[in-house]
Amino acid sequence: MKAEKTSLAVLTAQLTSPDGWQQLLPKGEFRSRDGSPTDVAHWFIDGTIAQNLIHKARQLNQDLLVDYDHETILKAKKGIDAGNVVAAGWFNADEIQWFDDETRQGLYIKPRWTPKAYQQIKDGEFAFLSAVFPYDENGTPLELRMAALTNDPGITGMQRLAVLSATLNPQENVKMPESLRKLLAKLGVEIAEGVELTEEQANTALNALETLQTDKTKADEQVATLSAKNTEVDLSQYVPKATYDAVMSQVAVLSAKTDDVEIDNHISKARNEGRAVEAEVEYLKQFGKQQGVAALSAMLEKRPQIAVLSAQQTQTTKVEKPVEKGTAVLSAADKEAAKLLGISEQDYAKELEAK
């Protein structure tokens, strides 16, 4: 397979952005003021290519160097160890971004300057930022190798370097407030102590906050909708509490009266059947009121019948008058015969005895 031909480009941009984002490459087609590139018609970058550059930088898993006047490249050309190059700053994939609006177009980086470089830029000692990147035969940048502070720009019309006095230098190791760490944790973003907040984490926290605001708005709308609905009570489904309480009170009274009647009936029945005696009537009434009619009935049903009590309480014994001695006992037919004869029953009985 034919190897893809790549070349190395060095371009320069002015440092002017007050928010820390510095233009590294312009949007669209561009060339260097020295006539480069000579092997392709021009270089070209758009949003898609920029995202590929950011992806490549993230795969490095380390910071990219910003040196002074491409000292790293110059030493490499001379065969000198580049390990002694002084860094002016550093940046990573989270500090590379594509802009395309009215004020900014192109690829931007947000370097973390060393204290020395920060002061030099602030004092105007350096004004431009130069990019180093390999490109293919179509002039498409393949990755960002590094950048450099310089006063010899590769292209014209780029933005100048600028810093704000409020810009924080990472060398100062400013600690994130504990309250901010807790707030971010509530939004689902955990930040370890001493670790800086990345752009991705900040966007995650912002999205979580926007979601909470959206949910609150929906909840407020639902409350307003429910409040606006007709709240009149359907009397076919509900009754006033006072009415309910009065009805339940009457039911309780009627139930108590009914229970008393049933208790008396059960006790009376038990006495008639020989299962209870007069002496325990009051006890049985109290038992029924306390334990219920069903419990009283079950208890009395289990009791055996006492024959003596049953006979005394439920049967009436008819005592016949003793018949006078010597007087026959008349049957109903005899009594009717005496009546027809016009004599008394005693006389008729005597006649029967005489016969």
From Swiss-Prot:
Any GO BP annotation: proteolysis
GO MF: peptidase activity
Family: Belongs to the peptidase U35 family.
Purpose: Potential protease involved in virion morphogenesis.
Species in which this protein is naturally found: Haemophilus influenzae (strain ATCC 51907 / DSM 11121 / KW20 / Rd)
InterPro entries: Phage_Mu_Gp1
Domain of life, source organism: Bacteria
UniProt keyword terms in alphabetical order: Hydrolase, Protease
Official protein name in the record: Mu-like prophage FluMu I protein
